[in-house]
């Protein structure tokens, strides 16, 4: 299973709220909902998040063996 828990940890570390992400970076609420519920996202979206947050993929997601 893919977990996006590191994404929220990265936001905390960088002191970025989800509101600020939506407002300043045009990240949709739908995307945040997908991340919150560990639903799939595209590699393009993953790339965009890494660019926006200036981070690596492992700062966005992690693999957890079922």
Language model segments and positions:
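Residue-level detection of the helix-turn-helix DNA-binding "recognition helix"
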Residues: 12, 23, 37, 62-65
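Short, basic-rich loop-to-helix N-cap that marks the start of a DNA-contacting helix
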Residues: 39-51
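Short C-terminal boundary/hinge segments that cap the last helix of small helical domains
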Residues: 54-66
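Short alpha-helical DNA-recognition segment
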Residues: 15-33
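Residues within the helices of the helix-turn-helix
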Residues: 19, 47, 58
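A short, Lys/Arg-rich alpha-helix, primarily the initiator
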Residues: 1-20
């Amino acid at each position: 299973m893919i977990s996006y828990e590191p994404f929220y940890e990265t936001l905390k570390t960088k002191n970025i709220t989800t509101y600020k992400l939506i407002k300043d970076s045009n990240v949709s609420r739908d995307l945040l909902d997908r991340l919150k519920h560990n639903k799939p996202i595209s590699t393009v979206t993953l790339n965009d998040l890494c660019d926006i947050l200036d981070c690596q993929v492992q700062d966005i997601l992690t693999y957890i063996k079922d």
